[in-house]
């Protein structure tokens, strides 16, 4: 089985037989290298660990190229089980799914996602597993194309891509406004391939690799100093509410009054130009709010001269569905943004006839949202055009290009109480930092229990609220104008460039075989 899927014929010099124990050790080593990537991401942010963990995979691939797919798959499985272990918290601890169902489901997503590093490893070894120019062309390009496909196929799940580990501490983060997170992915993989080559290279090659690495990483430092967008108008004061409502209480009828009062009091005590409440902060449909509540909220906002927006479920205009929306409550017309990129299994149920029975064991209200539609206009609040995205939507950089180009700032509303006290909320904050860097715009994050934050256009955090506390985070933000190179061209240059590099690696191989 291993031989059949591992790309036989990659390396004629490989032994024809390998002991099962050696194969097992190699697979475990790959999985362990993948698992350690957890510490490259937030909250640990050891960005230098990602190229090292990926270089460990490269070393294993060059030792045993015939098992390339399985080594890449083991690396991916270790990485995604480690990074997404919070899935168990959301399924078992919060949604109430029995452990005997939750535990296997935790492995399903990593088992699927690991296919992409497996296929990327197989493809690179199929082209040429030996350290050299063709490997440097093939491996990083194959890896990035795998990451791109992972973020696109079956609605996509780009969370945990290697490039996010570089946001914002690494010099490579400077490339995000240039080519987005996918260019950073590519450079991480290129760094890993070059790092693994150092051990086998001659002195002249080592010097060349080190000079190239210094130029690439040093250029990232220079790119970080470029201001890709410019201020527009005056700064405004912003207030971001964090209600800290436990997920098991959020939709409870007994806790409804407490939830509504929590956010009313936060609005009443706040003085700012713009205030944003988190995703589904008001746990009722808009037209089901208690009589007078909306007037009270508007009254407090009006007295403070404050624009107010809140996450709240809203029925579709035809009444047949419902939307995960953000409504401008202070505007009598109540314009809204409705989430378009829904979370599979969380906000809609794929294949309900096949897996619908699982939801009978779960406490998961509102799991059948309707998409809001693409190209929704930004909301105008406090004289600013604000492009909203809801929770998981800020995982998709290219989808935010259009909204960001029509707006002066970005805002994300989220409810991360689903994931308990895990790394999920810190990882999600890092995604938002990447979006700020890519678009050169402020990102205002209002979350239920963390990480509520104000992120500057350079991706750095201006202010952040302590998680698991009820508070209102205040600070300043300013609209920006102009487009970063990534906003102009999107992912296409990186994807086409990686395809061209793979083709070049193949052509060089054919040329070499022709000469012999």
Swiss-Prot record:
GO terms for cellular component: plasma membrane. GO terms for biological process: lipoprotein biosynthetic process. Belongs to the CN hydrolase family. Apolipoprotein N-acyltransferase subfamily. The keyword Transcription does not apply. Its EC number is 2.3.1.269. GO terms for molecular function: N-acyltransferase activity. Residues 241-481 form the CN hydrolase domain. This is Apolipoprotein N-acyltransferase.
């Amino acid at each position: 089985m291993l031989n059949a899927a591992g790309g036989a014929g990659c390396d004629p010099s490989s032994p024809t037989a390998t002991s099962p124990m050696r194969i097992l050790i190699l697979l475990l080593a790959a999985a362990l290298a993948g698992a350690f990537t957890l510490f490259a991401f937030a909250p640990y942010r050891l960005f230098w660990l990602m190229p090292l963990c990926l270089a460990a995979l490269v070393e294993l691939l060059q030792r045993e190229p015939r098992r390339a797919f399985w080594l890449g798959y083991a690396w991916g499985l270790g990485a995604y089980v480690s990074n997404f272990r919070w899935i168990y918290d959301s399924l078992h601890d919060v949604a109430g799914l029995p452990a005997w169902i939750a535990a296997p489901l935790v492995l399903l997503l990593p088992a699927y996602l690991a296919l992409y590093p497996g296929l990327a490893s197989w493809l690179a070894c199929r082209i040429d597993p030996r350290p050299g120019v063709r490997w440097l062309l093939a491996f990083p390009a194959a890896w990035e194309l795998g990451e791109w496909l992972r973020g696109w196929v079956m609605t996509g799940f780009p969370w945990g891509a290697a490039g996010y580990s570089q946001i914002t501490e690494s010099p490579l983060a400077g490339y995000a406004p240039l080519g987005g997170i996918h260019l950073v992915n590519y450079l991480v993989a290129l760094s890993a391939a070059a790092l693994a080559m150092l051990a086998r290279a001659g002195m002249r090659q080592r010097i060349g690799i080190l000079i190239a690495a210094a130029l690439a990483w040093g250029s990232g430092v220079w790119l970080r100093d470029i201001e890709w967008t410019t201020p527009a108008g005056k700064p405004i004061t912003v207030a971001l509410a964090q209600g800290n409502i436990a997920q098991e209480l959020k939709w409870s009828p007994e806790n409804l009054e407490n939830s509504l009062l929590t956010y009313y009091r936060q609005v009443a005590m706040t003085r700012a130009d713009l205030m944003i409440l988190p995703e589904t902060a008001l746990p009722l449909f808009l037209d089901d709010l208690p009589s007078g509540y909306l007037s009270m909220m508007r009254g407090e906002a009006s007295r403070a001269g404050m624009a107010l927006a809140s996450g709240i479920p809203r029925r579709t205009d035809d009444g047949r569905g419902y939307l995960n929306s953000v409504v401008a409550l202070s505007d009598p017309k109540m314009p809204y943004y409705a989430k378009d990129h829904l979370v599979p299994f969380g906000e809609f149920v794929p294949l309900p006839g096949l897996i619908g029975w699982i939801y009978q064991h779960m406490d998961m209200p509102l799991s059948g949202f309707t998409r809001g539609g693409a190209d929704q206009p930004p909301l105008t609040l406090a004289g600013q055009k604000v492009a909203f995205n809801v929770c998981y939507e800020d995982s998709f950089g290219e989808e935010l290009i259009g909204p960001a180009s029509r707006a002066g700032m970005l805002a994300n509303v989220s409810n991360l109480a689903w994931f308990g006290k895990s790394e999920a909320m810190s990882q999600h904050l890092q995604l938002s930092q990447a979006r700020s860097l890519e678009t050169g715009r402020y990102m205002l994050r209002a979350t239920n229990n963390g990480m509520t934050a104000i992120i500057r256009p350079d991706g750095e955090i201006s202010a952040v609220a302590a998680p698991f506390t009820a508070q209102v985070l205040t600070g300043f933000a300013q609209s920006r104008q102009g487009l970063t190179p990534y906003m102009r061209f999107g992912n296409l240059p990186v994807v086409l460039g990686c395809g061209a590099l793979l083709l070049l690696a193949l052509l060089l191989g054919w040329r070499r075989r022709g000469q012999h």
